[in-house]
Swiss-Prot record:
SUPFAM superfamilies associated with the record: Peptide deformylase
Region described as Disordered: spans on this chain: 1-21
Sample GO molecular function, one term: metal ion binding
Task of the protein: Removes the formyl group from the N-terminal Met of newly synthesized proteins. Requires at least a dipeptide for an efficient rate of reaction. N-terminal L-methionine is a prerequisite for activity but the enzyme has broad specificity at other positions.
Active site positions, chain numbering: E164
Catalytic activity: N-terminal N-formyl-L-methionyl-[peptide] + H2O = N-terminal L-methionyl-[peptide] + formate
Phosphoprotein keyword on record: no
Homology family: Belongs to the polypeptide deformylase family.
Name listed for the protein in its UniProt record: Peptide deformylase
Length: 201
């Protein structure tokens, strides 16, 4: 396992399956992933009132697209659907590890310890910057069968969940970056406009 969020997001060596979808994908993602500057990324998502086969199909397609793009997390708004749905797999090098499908996730507790870690995003390709977040969280959600679940998360998983949940509220990780010089430099290098960042610090 790599030491940085961005390194993990760049690596996808495995021969396993996840939700019957090969973790190693090649070519263009199955679904188009919206980029910084697209309005859909700034909208609040709506709760899913019924977990049915259409939601499970969407989750499978999101996983396929996430693996193809060599990511470790994807939120529905990133593919233009403003619903509270996330897919995450921080262990995609482990063929036996199952991905997480989080429906209507809600963080119920944040740990008091904060740490800074490098993040990247499939909606802002090529940009990797440090973001400060709580290192542990507790959350509740529904799984792909609609069953209520609770879990604790720490480390990379906790960070990835927080990162993807931000998307449900129209927030991107660049909005949380405190070093504006580094932010503007990275955005310019990758062809993004700093005016599309909405700082929340």
């Amino acid at each position: 396992m790599a030491n940085h969020f961005s390194q993990l997001a760049k690596k996808s060596r495995t021969n396993g399956n996840a939700e019957k979808i090969a973790k190693e994908q090649s070519g263009k993602p199955f679904l188009d992933i919206y980029k910084l500057g697209d309005d859909v990324l700034r909208q609040n998502s709506k709760r899913i009132t019924k977990v049915d086969e259409s939601i499970r199909k969407l989750a499978r397609e999101m996983l396929q697209s996430m693996y193809a793009a060599k990511g470790i997390g994807l939120a529905a708004p990133q593919i233009g659907i403003n619903k509270e749905l996330l897919v995450i797999d921080v262990n995609f090098e482990d063929s036996a590890a199952e991905p997480l499908i989080l429906i209507n996730p809600e963080i119920t507790d944040f740990g008091t310890t904060l740490n800074s870690y490098e993040e990247g995003c499939l909606s802002i390709p090529g940009v990797y910057l440090n973001v400060v977040r709580p290192s542990t969280i507790k959350l509740k959600f529904r799984d792909e069968m609609g069953r209520p679940r609770k879990m604790k998360a720490d480390g990379l998983l906790a960070r990835c969940i927080q990162h993807e949940m931000d998307h449900l509220n129209g927030i991107l990780f660049v909005d949380r970056v405190t070093s504006k010089d580094d932010l503007n430099k990275e955005l310019l290098k990758e062809g993004f406009n700093e005016k599309d960042v909405i700082s929340i610090n």
